[in-house]
Amino acid sequence: VLMYLESEEDNSINLTEMQKEAVVQSILNGVTVITGGPGTGKTTIILSIIKIFEAMNKKVLLCAPTGRAAKRITESTGREAKTIHRLLEYAYGENDSNLVFNRNENSPLDCHAIIVDEMSMVDILLMNNLLKALKRGTKLIMVGDVDQLPSVGAGNILSDIIKSNTIRTIR
């Protein structure tokens, strides 16, 4: 991974040592959190991760909790990003009152890795459904700023994950 980052193949992106560490950990670990404030290079890290997975012929899915965040990450990476709801193929249940997701443990997402941007805005219900839709072995890379807006729904997932000290977090 480091050799790719430092190769002539990709000299369009200059990463700091901490950004390189975030990229390497994301490629190697099953679950990774990347957190930092505005302007710390989170989007640059995301683009580097995508390029490495693409060089390995691995499919990566990009998503975010809101349409605005998905559009922003699409524009900055040049890769399609969807809202988490759209990625999970949401639909309304029988009586139009409950939301169901067609991507779940019975019909998981087909990818090697999934990158969730603006993770601070993801609530516990959406996170639960996203996790259900991941196949065993799918890498989960969560990116966000813990000091940004928390989710409207229940749960402060990103903050709780970081505080737990159980998942590799790069700041």
Regions found by a protein language model. Name each.
Residues 1-171:
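Conserved ATP-binding/catalytic motifs of P-loop helicase motor domains
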